[in-house]
């Protein structure tokens, strides 16, 4: 169990705490976006220090930023690159990363990408999402799918964006920074007990 602590705006209030049982993080975001290499490396190091392993997709943009950072990190063996197409496996393996097609054959490209995304979300404990597509200045469809499916599966998501996701009765939304590296918002499915997600609400 890994516990995260989020300070609240009212200084008198105790920090909000939530826990995740597993130790795998999905690194995801816009295929047109980017994160500086040093920032990716810092995030990877901080997550690995907590014992996390990594899932990352096969697309361009944010996926590529994290793949390249993982490839030169000491933790490259603790990463799975989930691919929608066999043609993308070779590039990830050429970086020294483990990669595999995770969808059944015969799907359309759009369906394969969707299935790959859902495969990663289901197997992750939490998600780091960089959702804004800079070409349109809003969330892309892939990022929306990641967020919706993570909430459905009760996985906390750190959204690295200037504007928060929409308010919802299904999760708590908290402005925060991640390891002092990224500013954004935690979206945390409603907790119970020691901080685990409450399946009974869904």
What are these regions, as identified by a protein language model?
Residues 2-23, 31-180, 193:
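Acidic/glycine-enriched connector segments
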Residues 25-27, 202:
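Non-catalytic, mobile gating and regulatory segments of ester bond hydrolases
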Residues 165, 184-185, 189:
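Helicase-associated low-complexity regulatory tails and linkers flanking the ATPase motor
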Residues 188-201:
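A charged, well-structured terminal subsegment
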């Amino acid at each position: 169990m890994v516990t995260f602590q989020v300070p609240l705006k009212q200084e008198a209030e105790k920090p909000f705490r939530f826990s995740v049982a597993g130790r795998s993080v999905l690194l995801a975001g816009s295929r047109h976006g980017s994160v500086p290499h040093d920032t990716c490396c810092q995030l990877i190091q901080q997550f690995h220090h907590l014992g996390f392993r990594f899932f990352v997709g096969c697309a361009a943009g944010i996926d590529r930023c994290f793949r390249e950072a993982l490839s030169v990190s000491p933790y490259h063996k603790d990463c799975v690159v989930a691919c929608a197409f066999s043609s993308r496996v070779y590039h990830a393996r050429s970086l020294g990363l483990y990669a595999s097609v995770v969808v059944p054959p015969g799907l359309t490209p759009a369906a394969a990408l969707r299935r790959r995304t859902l495969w990663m979300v289901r197997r992750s404990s939490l998600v780091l999402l960089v959702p804004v597509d800079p070409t349109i200045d809003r969330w892309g469809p892939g990022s929306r799918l990641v967020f919706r499916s993570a909430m459905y599966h009760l996985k906390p998501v750190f959204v690295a964006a200037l504007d928060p996701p929409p308010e919802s009765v299904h999760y708590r939304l908290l402005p925060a920074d991640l390891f002092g590296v990224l500013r954004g918002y935690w979206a945390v499915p409603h907790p119970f007990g020691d901080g685990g997600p409450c399946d009974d609400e869904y």
